[in-house]
Amino acid sequence: MKKFSILVCLSCLCTSFSYAQVIDCDDPTSSSLKKICSDQFKDIRQKLDTQSMTAFLISDAPQRLLVDTHQLWLNRLQQCKSLACYQQQMDFRIDDLNFYTSLNQSLTQHYLKFEHGTIAKQPVHLQVHQLSKDKIKIEGNAYRSPNNRIETQTISFLAYTTPDQKQNITDNENNCHYQFNFQKAILSVKSESKACNRFVGVYRVYD
């Protein structure tokens, strides 16, 4: 029984390690991966691997969230057209992993926008934080091109509400009004304003 438990633990560690490897440089298949796998980025790749492994081992964030946000980030990284962009995106991912590792995720629900069963091509990540018994904070980002200036790479979302007023939400960043429909596995977001449609859609919950 003891040997079996050890084997199970080792299996879990190996699975986590395979997911935690940020970039596979054994056989880079694209020109962008070849740039990322160059010696110039060796130190930050190692830092990313370490931080990713730490997140998988000790974060209370759902592992599926770590996997899917990694893929989302990797897709964005491969859109980069400059070395500065690569560096910037890797720094951003380290910050994200630090967030998942250092903060209590048990009071936060994460949502990624999905289209046709996969993560949306124009990704959106919403987070619903239970700040207290009577206060909820909803924040998020709609991602744009990583080649934009830093201040235009994302569209921010920020709202505060209460548990009994979670359906009608006003985004303080853009003064947009939304109807949030929280269900067991998904979140549906609607708006009557076409100017606010960037956050409209169906989201998968990670818990």
Where are these regions (language model features)?
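Sec/Tat signal peptide C-region and signal peptidase I cleavage site
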Residues: T15-A20
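Amphipathic, heptad-repeat alpha-helical segments
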Residues: D24-D26, S32-L66
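Mid-chain, structured segments of secreted extracytoplasmic proteins
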Residues: F56, P62-T101, Q165-N175
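Contiguous, well-ordered beta-strand patches that form the walls/edges
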Residues: N75-L77, A142-K184
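Tryptophan-anchored aromatic micro-motifs
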Residues: S102-H125, Y203-Y206
